[in-house]
């Protein structure tokens, strides 16, 4: 997932150098107000990042992704994703991925249009954090 034009350019350069294509999702910040410790672009800037990805050789615009804010109502938090997805699809109609929701909030994510969910904890159980 990508939330800054600088990352789009760097990923595009690396993909060209490797002779590969890379599918990128626009990471949407659902925190209100925005939490600087968490990634993502505000919903109003999604199209700008989508256009940057679409313009970059070797990058494929795939759609959007988001994680619900900590402690927020997931159904309410995920509500902006469908309009964000429409903004991305205005840039590239094939960019239909909405990646949102994890084991604890997948129903709310699917209810708001998620096409991909991350359910590692539901499948594998709780795991200890990776400490380096």
Locations of the language-model features?
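Conserved alpha/beta-domain cores
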Residues: 1-104, 110-112, 121-126
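Active-site loop ensemble at the mouth of alpha/beta enzyme cores that anchors a bound cofactor
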Residues: 116, 129-132
């Amino acid at each position: 997932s990508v939330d800054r034009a600088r990352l789009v350019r760097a990923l595009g350069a690396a993909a060209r150098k490797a002779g590969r294509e890379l599918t990128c999702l626009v990471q949407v910040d659902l925190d209100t107000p925005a939490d600087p410790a968490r990634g993502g672009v505000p919903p109003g800037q999604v199209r700008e990042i989508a256009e940057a990805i679409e313009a970059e050789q070797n990058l494929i615009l795939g759609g959007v992704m988001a994680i619900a804010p900590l402690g927020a109502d997931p159904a309410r938090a995920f509500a902006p994703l469908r309009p964000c997805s429409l903004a991305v699809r205005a840039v590239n109609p094939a960019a239909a991925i909405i990646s949102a929701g994890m084991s604890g909030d997948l129903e709310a994510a699917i209810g708001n249009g998620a096409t991909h969910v991350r359910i590692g904890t539901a499948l594998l159980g709780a795991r200890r954090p990776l400490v380096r």
